[in-house]
């Protein structure tokens, strides 16, 4: 391994989301992003889930793929995208959520089931979950 005993930072100063989606998402997520910006966090979005996750894993941050008006259940596939990265995140001290539930607790109902997806530094994901559930 290139990084033995890897640990994801509990907090970060990076948020990763396609901000082109902002007209179509929950206003609470917009509030969260504004909060991140006020605290000095920077936006970093490559457009590759794995590359974006890897950067946040090393430096600390959160990746957001919320549901939109067009994709009411999100776009990330639960079984072969979200679960794999959620497992890795939890092994290094991070967290993954659909905004309500821990990703690894979601019982799949279909092979290609999609889910909203929030993954990264534990404190950032917890804060977003609190905002989404308030």
Each predicted region: which residue ranges?
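IMPase-like, lithium-sensitive Mg2+-dependent phosphomonoesterase catalytic core
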Residues: 1-134
